[in-house]
Amino acid sequence: MIYDHILVRYGELTLKGANRKIFVNKLRSNVKLALMPLQGYTVKANRDRMYIELDEGADIEEMCNRLKKVFGIYSISPVLKIEKTVEAVNELAVRFAKEYADGDTFKIDVKRSDKNFPYDTYALQRTVGGAVLDATNHLSVDVHNPDHNIKVEVRLDAIYMYDQVIEGSGGLPVGTGGKTLLMLSGGIDSPVAGIEVMRRGVTVEAIHFHSPPFTSEKAKEKVIELTRILSGHVGPIKLHIVPFTDLQKQVNKVVHERYTMTSTRRMMMRVADKVVHDIDAHAIVNGENLGQVASQTLKSMYAINHVTSTPVLRPLLTLDKEDIVKKAKEIGTFDVSIQPYEDCCTIFTPKNPITEPDIEKVEKYEIGYDFEPLVQQAVDGIETLLITSDYQSEKDTATQALADDLF
């Protein structure tokens, strides 16, 4: 079937009132950004839905794959726009039906927003269903659980027909909910946390703490790849890579071994707090999950949070690990996250870390050394990369150039 439009149904933004236009306009911009590399389409949005007009030869499959990742979209359907006659509806319904397998069932589902159309909803359903049965001998009707649902939308300008509904990502358009800084470790949890806040319309920049030579270049490349996957949902993402070696080594010199994990995370939070203000963000996001590891007890979180007044969002706080893994697999980050490259959270891990840290004790250990210059040094040394869905590292680019020269 050759379609001429893609119908985009809005998600939660349909609940908005006077400010709905802001959300629709942002979603339209995000859709254009997602489709930008492709050709042969025009995006038209109104208050209730969006239509993408397709030129001949447009890559509908690739467009749908991109659109279903855009937050704010409830579902999409490739559709055909036809003239407002019963004959045209019958003809197209029969074309749909002839592609179905022997023994399949179908249903005709009509929505009629144009009340001046000469057939009411039920009369049109009966007429079109009868036309399909008359023209085929391999199908039967099932109005409760059909294999195929042929949908007919009678609107003021035309009739739109389709038989596919592709689930979207839901949520709100990214860019309507402020900006956050995502602490991206390289593990399973933090990319999922990033997706969850982006689903609520929040723009994300990411921060990663890199401690060479204790963490390898492979660990850095892993985080870049995770950011690249996330950017497939929202467009380019800034990744701030923090040189954390000196700060982490000093923590391990002056802080009691059982408290080094708590203190290390406090230093990360101090760096992140400065970056939040530099990029004009409004919160810090991490992938912490209550009780999952020693640093994720309530007392640990309290001790770590104590160094910042910036809100810290934890979208995964109460989820089971199995649910987080499932989400990671769905968004495509799981296989990257489990690559066995250590990050700065796993090096120098004490054998018996404190799980219920006393905030007065950790402050006592830290007060013996002025960490502020090292914190500022880490901020000043940040490397910022703009990661897109087709991002290639300098190493990858050089390798590709060499291959092109050789072959």
From Swiss-Prot:
CDD domains the record matches: PPase_ThiI, THUMP_ThiI
Signal peptide: none
InterPro entries, per database record: Rossmann-like_a/b/a_fold, ThiI_AANH, ThiI_fer, ThiI_N, THUMP_dom, THUMP_ThiI, tRNA_STrfase, tRNA_sulfurtransferase_ThiI
Entry binding sites for ATP: 183-184, 208-209, 265, 287, 296
One Pfam family per UniProt: ThiI
Ranges where the THUMP domain occurs: 61-165
Gene Ontology CC: cytosol
Sample GO molecular function, one term: tRNA-uracil-4 sulfurtransferase activity
Any one GO BP annotation for this protein: tRNA 4-thiouridine biosynthesis
Pathway per the UniProt entry: Cofactor biosynthesis; thiamine diphosphate biosynthesis
Keywords: ATP-binding, Cytoplasm, Nucleotide-binding, RNA-binding, Thiamine biosynthesis, Transferase, tRNA-binding
Top-level taxon: Bacteria
Reaction it catalyzes: [ThiI sulfur-carrier protein]-S-sulfanyl-L-cysteine + a uridine in tRNA + 2 reduced [2Fe-2S]-[ferredoxin] + ATP + H(+) = [ThiI sulfur-carrier protein]-L-cysteine + a 4-thiouridine in tRNA + 2 oxidized [2Fe-2S]-[ferredoxin] + AMP + diphosphate; [ThiS sulfur-carrier protein]-C-terminal Gly-Gly-AMP + S-sulfanyl-L-cysteinyl-[cysteine desulfurase] + AH2 = [ThiS sulfur-carrier protein]-C-terminal-Gly-aminoethanethioate + L-cysteinyl-[cysteine desulfurase] + A + AMP + 2 H(+)
EC number: 2.8.1.4
Subcellular location: Cytoplasm
Matches recorded under PROSITE patterns: THUMP
UniProt function note: Catalyzes the ATP-dependent transfer of a sulfur to tRNA to produce 4-thiouridine in position 8 of tRNAs, which functions as a near-UV photosensor. Also catalyzes the transfer of sulfur to the sulfur carrier protein ThiS, forming ThiS-thiocarboxylate. This is a step in the synthesis of thiazole, in the thiamine biosynthesis pathway. The sulfur is donated as persulfide by IscS.
Family statement drawn from the similarity comment of this UniProt entry: Belongs to the ThiI family.
Protein name: Probable tRNA sulfurtransferase
